Amino acid sequence: MLRSLRRRGLYLRLIGLVVLLAAMYIAFMTNKYYLLFITNLVFFAAIVLAWNIIGGYAGQLDLGTTGYMGVGAIVSSILSNNIGLHPLISIILGGLSSALLAGAIGFPMFRFGVREVWYALSTAAIVVILNNAVRLLIGPYEYYLRVRPIKTYDELYLATSIALVLVFLLNHAVNNSRLGYYLKAIREDELAAEAIGVDTRRYKLLALMIYAFIVGSLGYLYVVMIGYFYTYRFFDTGISVSIAILGIIGGLGSIEGCLVSAFLLRGVGEYLRTSLAHIIPGLHLLLYGAVLITLGVVEPEGIPGIARRFTTLLKTTKRPVGGVK
């Protein structure tokens, strides 16, 4: 009974997501600028959902997103362009390379008990190290990677939408699996999880590698979107921090909350950038930061907390005066 209800709920959420993606495409398909704009939103929604696995379920504040995405982008682009592998195979291998890198990094950190703020600082430092390593290999300027299997913005939107749906389904699979239960136990109280027999190192490492595989695979799409490989964009701690912020405001472990946060807040940020950046440089960042701070102060639990408040308000307004039915 419970399983059938969960399955029905998943189907309804999946249909809702597909309808939303289709409606966005129909609304903006005639305007290439706005089509690329919503493609960017869909892409970052997939990235935020990937972060939700390590940050939302496992409770690890990971700031290395762009590092794994950049490594996956380089590997998949070179395999596709220079060696001639099929783009899909290249994407998978790029994701695997990021997952292996995450495993090599995460194993010693979890083995020696690196956690909380020290884990966040370590992952941010990894992005800086990777940035400088790549600059030594390909130079300090933009590097053109000739990857254009996707010829139109319509195809690019379709590809990013498929990626988002797949990451959405993977989140649900993790959430309702034994892995998800263990990760949430680790998030709530790691010492208590260890006390009841959960191998916290193993499951945190597994969550890290799954997350790195997803963002590494998505790195190829990011190269296709912008056309160039910019080291300062692919290995940017600022983008990693913004993704973590979107995941936190979306609610740790909340799939729908992360989607709302990514679409809404990322959309607001991009709108402010395109509207105000030419007026006063940096004004859009100031306003965007003010929006994030306000959300954090008003509702520390993020989007789920706002949804609960709104639901409670609706129930209160429907109740007759004096509580008499």
Feature roles, as predicted:
Residues 124-159, 180, 300-306:
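Extracellular/periplasmic helix-loop junction at the C-terminal end of a transmembrane helix
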Residues 83-126, 260-264:
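Alpha-helical transmembrane segments within multi-pass membrane transporters and channels
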Residues 1-21, 137, 188-190, 194-202, ...:
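Cytosolic-side transmembrane-helix boundaries in multi-pass membrane proteins
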Residues 35-39, 147-169, 285-289:
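Loop-to-helix entry region at the N-terminal start of transmembrane alpha-helices
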Residues 1-46, 75, 83-90, 323-325:
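Membrane-interfacial amphipathic/re-entrant helices at transmembrane-helix boundaries
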Residues 208-293, 298:
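Transmembrane alpha-helical segments in multi-pass inner-membrane proteins
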Residues 31-83, 104, 108-118, 190-194, ...:
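Single transmembrane alpha-helix segments in multi-pass membrane proteins
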Residues 153-230:
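Helix-loop-helix "hairpin" substructures at the membrane interface of multi-pass membrane proteins
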